[in-house]
Amino acid sequence: MAVNVFTILQLAVFAAIVLNVNLHSVSADSKGTSDSQDSTKSIKVDFCETNCTKTDGGWTGCTGDCICVSVGDSIEGRCMDFG
């Protein structure tokens, strides 16, 4: 009787492992390219020749179609064109 219980437990563990591996492979296959990664919806970004700084009234230094982009709370940034 003890052998039968041990065999049943082994089969149950084996079935759980196979089921887990099967579910993992199915979910990994379902992760295709999302719409946000579609190359037809990408934007073109160019660096402009100037940098920019934050003053009391706002950001200054960018010309033309360039806008100032900064990181965090920095008072210095880089002018970029999102044409």
UniProtKB/Swiss-Prot annotation:
Signal peptide: 1-28
Glycosylation sites recorded in the entry for this protein: 51
GO CC, any one term: extracellular region
Alphabetized UniProt keyword annotations: Disulfide bond, Glycoprotein, Secreted, Signal
Disulphide-bonded residues: 48-66, 52-68, 62-79
Name the record gives this protein: Evasin P1124
GO MF: C-X-C chemokine binding
Primary localization class, coarse: secreted
Subcellular location field: Secreted
